[in-house]
């Protein structure tokens, strides 16, 4: 396929799993992916909002464009179910968008409680690692796929969440480490 402005964003035949996709940035990503031809998995903790967003996308782009799959990102079992249901519905996962996150604390590092810090690590780092580990093998086998990790403007002002968003990843080139904290 040749690339032109017309087909540069054509996602026909692609499937995307998007965490935190019932509102805000995640919902906008899901809507735009569907508008460009992708099939999308809508996911957040609560079933109602997942069904609502998937229903709206299906109403606009046709039945089967979106599925709803509630999942708690802090649960490895929920994430595996999310991957399994997406694979069952669409046959493969081409794009993973790690958008869901939490920030139970905003303030100086000296004031954060252990439970809050552990929740940030679990939801903002460990869950992304699990999800990528679950999906990467099929992408590597096909030699095709994309992983997108959404960050926040929280990196513009130092907080404990900035630490989790800027932490190095062995799979990222040195030049990209920490770049996500400013997005």
Regions found by a protein language model. Give the residues of each.
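Flexible N-terminal pre-Rossmann segment of NAD(P)-dependent oxidoreductases
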Residues: 1-17
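Conserved glycine-rich Rossmann-like NAD(P)H-binding loop of the short-chain dehydrogenase/reductase
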Residues: 36-53
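The beta1-alpha1 cofactor-binding region of Rossmann-like NAD(H)/NADP(H)-dependent oxidoreductases
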Residues: 47-48, 70-82, 114
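A short, exposed helix-loop element centered on a Lys and neighboring polar residues
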Residues: 132-133
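Residue(s) in the substrate-gating loop at a strand-loop-helix junction
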Residues: 152
């Amino acid at each position: 396929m040749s690339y032109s402005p017309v087909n540069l964003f054509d996602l026909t035949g692609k499937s995307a799993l998007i965490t935190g996709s019932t509102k805000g940035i995640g919902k906008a990503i899901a809507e735009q992916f569907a508008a460009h031809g992708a099939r999308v998995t809508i996911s957040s903790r609560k079933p109602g909002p997942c069904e609502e967003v998937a229903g709206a996308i299906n109403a606009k782009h046709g039945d089967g464009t979106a599925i709803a799959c509630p999942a708690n990102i802090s649960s490895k079992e929920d994430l595996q179910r999310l991957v399994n249901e997406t694979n069952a519905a669409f046959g493969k996962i081409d794009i993973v968008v790690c958008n869901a996150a939490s920030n139970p604390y905003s303030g100086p590092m000296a004031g954060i409680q252990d439970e809050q810090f552990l929740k940030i690590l679990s939801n903002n780092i460990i869950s992304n690692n699990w999800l990528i580990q679950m999906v990467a093998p099929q992408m590597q086998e096909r030699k095709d796929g994309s992983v997108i990790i959404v960050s926040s403007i929280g990196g513009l002002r130092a907080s404990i969440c900035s630490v989790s968003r800027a932490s190095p990843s062995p799979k990222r080139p040195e030049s990209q480490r920490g770049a996500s904290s400013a997005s």
